[in-house]
Regions:
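Histidine-dependent nucleotide/RNA phosphoesterase domain, centered on the 2H-phosphoesterase fold
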Residues: 1-113
Length: 113
């Protein structure tokens, strides 16, 4: 199964993205439901089911050492990946340091599996 780490978008941001998408229809693909919009932090690729429990345990351990907090990130650019046919929103600004550290930690953790 293909796995990734992500954060849900705040409801107001998901609504804003959905409204933007309705005002700027794209001919290709199907829209992602608002409830599935997210900020991808680390893509793990293909993992086997037997790897899930150790991955979850390692993730819990890593996240237990972090203090949750809010991070602001402006979504100000759009792009398209032909394969798998995905439009994405991104930011031209560097993410806040705490968000960068979280993503880096999850990428390193995912690399162990």
């Amino acid at each position: 199964m293909r796995l990734f780490f992500a954060l849900d978008l705040p409801p107001a941001t998901a609504r804003a993205v959905t409204l933007w998408r309705e005002r700027n229809p794209i001919a290709a693909g199907r829209p992602v439901p608002a409830a599935n919009l997210h900020l991808t932090l680390a893509f793990l690729g293909e993992l086997e089911e037997r790897q899930l429990e150790p991955l979850c345990e390692a993730t819990d351990a890593q996240l237990a050492s972090r203090t949750p907090g809010a991070a602001r990130l402006a979504l100000d650019c759009v792009g398209y990946w032909p394969r798998p046919g995905v439009f994405w929103l991104g930011s031209t600004q560097a993410p806040p340091p705490a968000l960068q550290a979280l993503a880096r930690g999850l990428q390193q953790l995912g690399g162990r599996f």
